[in-house]
């Protein structure tokens, strides 16, 4: 399957709040369709919805998600926790968590258009896996800084995770360490994703 480019609010109404997909929030209890649809949920449906939350939040294709699950399965530790750590350490997600972009698709666009440097080198791959001590900056060009300036100037919607630090005057972010499981931005049962 390809990356989802359709209406985002439909997915949010169906799956709940996904901060990486869009900044919009569904009205609580006002949607009649969800009240009609809330019948008995099968185990398959529960697992599928958890997997879809993960896919749409991080902007992954089905193949990418399968690859991440395979890598997490080979690593030491809980497969679900390792999977979330791998996804949280992607460059597009780190830009979103630093507040340099409003959504993960917006962060992907910044990376694809070569506005972002990692350790002084241009990186144009949104799935680039950041490591501890990586320094993430924008190009020195005025256009690159102007794209990010609005997002850095506004207060972040949520608290900055402990594994990241940002210097908003120099348009620079630093990855201090691998993310801890309590700072993961999406509330999800990762074991259901692995079981799916």
From Swiss-Prot:
<dbReference type="Pfam" id="PF01479">
    <property type="entry name" value="S4"/>
</dbReference>
<dbReference type="InterPro" id="IPR022801">
    <property type="entry name" value="Ribosomal_uS4"/>
</dbReference>
<dbReference type="Pfam" id="PF00163">
    <property type="entry name" value="Ribosomal_S4"/>
</dbReference>
<keyword id="KW-0150">Chloroplast</keyword>
<dbReference type="GO" id="GO:0042274">
    <property type="term" value="P:ribosomal small subunit biogenesis"/>
</dbReference>
<dbReference type="GO" id="GO:0009507">
    <property type="term" value="C:chloroplast"/>
</dbReference>
<comment type="similarity">
    <text>Belongs to the universal ribosomal protein uS4 family.</text>
</comment>
<dbReference type="GO" id="GO:0015935">
    <property type="term" value="C:small ribosomal subunit"/>
</dbReference>
<comment type="function">
    <text>One of the primary rRNA binding proteins, it binds directly to 16S rRNA where it nucleates assembly of the body of the 30S subunit.</text>
</comment>
<dbReference type="InterPro" id="IPR001912">
    <property type="entry name" value="Ribosomal_uS4_N"/>
</dbReference>
<dbReference type="InterPro" id="IPR036986">
    <property type="entry name" value="S4_RNA-bd_sf"/>
</dbReference>
<dbReference type="InterPro" id="IPR018079">
    <property type="entry name" value="Ribosomal_uS4_CS"/>
</dbReference>
<feature type="region of interest" description="Disordered">
    <location>
        <begin position="16"/>
        <end position="36"/>
    </location>
</feature>
<keyword id="KW-0687">Ribonucleoprotein</keyword>
<dbReference type="GO" id="GO:0019843">
    <property type="term" value="F:rRNA binding"/>
</dbReference>
<comment type="subunit">
    <text>Part of the 30S ribosomal subunit. Contacts protein S5. The interaction surface between S4 and S5 is involved in control of translational fidelity.</text>
</comment>
<dbReference type="InterPro" id="IPR002942">
    <property type="entry name" value="S4_RNA-bd"/>
</dbReference>
<dbReference type="InterPro" id="IPR005709">
    <property type="entry name" value="Ribosomal_uS4_bac-type"/>
</dbReference>
<protein>
    <recommendedName>
        <fullName>Small ribosomal subunit protein uS4c</fullName>
    </recommendedName>
</protein>
<keyword id="KW-0699">rRNA-binding</keyword>
<dbReference type="GO" id="GO:0003735">
    <property type="term" value="F:structural constituent of ribosome"/>
</dbReference>
<keyword id="KW-0689">Ribosomal protein</keyword>
<keyword id="KW-0934">Plastid</keyword>
<comment type="function">
    <text>With S5 and S12 plays an important role in translational accuracy.</text>
</comment>
<dbReference type="GO" id="GO:0006412">
    <property type="term" value="P:translation"/>
</dbReference>
<feature type="domain" description="S4 RNA-binding">
    <location>
        <begin position="89"/>
        <end position="150"/>
    </location>
</feature>
<keyword id="KW-0694">RNA-binding</keyword>
